[in-house]
UniProtKB/Swiss-Prot annotation:
The gene is rnj. It comes from the Bacteria. This is Ribonuclease J. One of its GO terms (biological process) is rRNA processing. It is found in: Cytoplasm.
Amino acid sequence: MKKAKAHHDMAQDEELVFLPLGGVGEIGMNLGLYGYGRPGHRQWIMVDCGVTFPGPELPGVDLVLPDIAFLAEQRRNLKAIIITHAHEDHYGALNDLWPGLNVPVYASPFTAGMLEAKRAFEKSRSEIPITIFKQGDRINVGPFSVEAVGVNHSIPEPMALVIRTQLGTVVHTGDWKIDLEPSLGPLTDESRFRQIGEEGVLALVCDSTNALREGVSPSERQVSESLAKIIADAEGRVGITTFSSNVGRIRSVAEAAEAAGREVLLLGSSMKRVVDVARDVGLMEGVKPFLAEDEFGYIPRDKVVVILTGSQGEPRAALAKIARDEMRNVAFSAGDTIVFSSRTIPGNEKAINDIKNGLIEQGIHIITDSEALVHVSGHPRRTELQQMYQWVKPQILVPVHGEAAHLTAHAELGLQSGIPSVPRLRNGEMLRLAPGPAEVIDEAPHGRIYKDGTLIGDFEEMGIGERRKLSFAGHVSVSVVLDSRYDFLGDPDVVPIGLPEFDDEGEAMEDTLYDAVLGAVESIPRAKRKDLAMLQEAVRRAVRSTTNQVWGKKPVVTVFITKV
């Protein structure tokens, strides 16, 4: 009887928790952990493993990844990683972080293909074994039973997850929308969500991206019709730039081009990789082969459509090269049309406007989503969110995938819609979903790490603070050689990098700094110059002070003093 009571007490201690390490309080870098068991003995599954992209405040950084230090002690208790879809903010960190985790990965055929294509392109040494997991499948992982439910989004084969445990069922939506006329893939599975709702849902962990927008998102089919009309009516070449992962839109454009008697050229390596994967899994059946780039010049202007990367102003993408007239085999002319079939991601406005201006200077006609319905979001607006609430009838709503404004608006909508519990949650906070009321019970290490080239590290390890200083005020290198009497042996060597060439009186900056170095050393008696560290610091301070006087900024200064 004692053993039975002990087992009962242990069972009573078991908890179901949700711990986001990214994507809650920000857009991007989505990574969520579900844990089950007693504190200190929980087993975990990871849902998604995404990146976000650096802004100008992170000079030189290529990608921003979630810090998974929390999992260092939980590595043996992490049972699986499940990827909901192949957008960078949901799967982009997996190739870099998986070697430190080495656990089974579950993903759809398209997502698995994208992971392999990404690994090959990045020349990653880690070959991730992936188990195919698609709409309608169920897997048992430790204390979790996970079902994939089909949803609609702006990429092939997205899925929501139904995570069942002894303490209740969680619906994790991933990215989704309700589109009754999608251009590719099935509808969001209303029937299955309703069935799951009838079974009883403890918590809905739900996309908040468009929680500030009223109504229902327009259909992708409407975008297809709008693009088809633009292509049919255009007199010259047509270029359409969109997100490279939007296979449905690429396919729609290709079909519209064929209907208008036009050939299609794909430009951009990322888009070509996506289309190759889509072909491999059967998503491009019936679409004619695309032109080779060197065939472009032989096609009449009114017989070609170019689908190209660069909708976010990426300087090395195909569209930016077109705007700068730098492409070898492809160019647009006055009277041609380029359509921005995309939204502007915050932070990219200037880069996109620069490209638009470059195109307009060439006489190219620009069409954006402010002039025509050429883009729709892949995320649910408020009416769609309320529809999901009605389908699954959750006891708890956990808004995720959004910044503070999105999460707050989503929470208010949930409460207005009658959901009993809507806890506030941010990255690193451990939310107990059951037993008892939903509440934050702990905080885990969380944050960001940075990928630069082939290296990954934290803010200090990657020298980002120093880079910021360098980008703001440049660098001065000073080399001083002293003889046995601690006098100058030759002239000091002063090399300013990234500083103005002249001060406001026309004096060369290098000469001004040279004088500062001489003055700093000569102001110190010979006997005290033996303290090379003190002398080094005196020179550094003198150079920074002088540049501050003549320029108003203090550069990074590196001083080398050698005594021979």
